[in-house]
């Protein structure tokens, strides 16, 4: 039930972000005498996002200073991932470990054939084997559900909207007319558009990311057959990430949406702009999936 609802919600959110893009495009096209110039910014935004998607694995792994690990180094991690990949009838991703003690894990890569799963030293020390299995099941389902593609497309659209909005506010007066008898683009409307459109696109993008987290929780729990193991891991991660957050460096911020838990401290209004749903809600859903009653 949750799975169908989340899939529908993702589709609706994509419709919303496309709606914002079409709205801002229509407004600027009606305001400027050279609407074709906007195409340049669309191409730039899409090209930048495509590059980020194609190189997402390397970017995230470098940001976390991760290194590949052999089966001799991490036999338990290899065994769990091999068993779960076999159960899912999917390719086994490459395995990495990050030296940071901040407890977290993430998956990245273009597709199941070119994927990587990374655990930090902190999470390997924090969780027991059952909980680690739950986390790895979650990460594998991000790969197998192609959530990296989903988040990249959402990011691409948000980037295009931001580029067009910036174009409008900085060059609107130049392209909006100005000769006698010609109507000039409304500078106040352009300013509001440049502020509100990227904000709306970002909020929708983050909502898509949160929805995909719910699906990875549920699908990963079904893959392992142990929803309560992932729920237990999330409880530990909620406390662990608060005690040992990652520094808010740009490279880490750009990769944070891939991680199983929000790696930064964030309270109050900051929660609205979190790439992750509330831990309490994720845990409650997993307990409901297991038929757990308080």
Curated annotation (Swiss-Prot):
EC annotation from Swiss-Prot or TrEMBL: 3.4.24.-
UniProt xrefs under Pfam families: Peptidase_M48
Note on how the cofactor is bound: Binds 1 zinc ion per subunit.
UniProt-annotated binding residues for Zn(2+): 138, 142, 213
Alphabetized UniProt keyword annotations: Cell membrane, Hydrolase, Membrane, Metal-binding, Metalloprotease, Protease, Transmembrane, Transmembrane helix, Zinc
Biological process, per Gene Ontology: proteolysis
Top-level enzyme category: hydrolase
GO cellular component: plasma membrane
Any one Gene Ontology molecular-function term assigned to this protein's record: zinc ion binding
Transmembrane segments: 12-32, 34-54, 152-172, 188-208
Predominant subcellular localization, coarse grouping: membrane
Membrane topology reported for the UniProt record: Multi-pass membrane protein
PROSITE patterns in the cross-refs: ZINC_PROTEASE
Cofactor or coenzyme needed: Zn(2+)
Active site: 139
PANTHER family linked: PROTEASE HTPX
Assigned protein family: Belongs to the peptidase M48B family.
Protein known as: Protease HtpX homolog
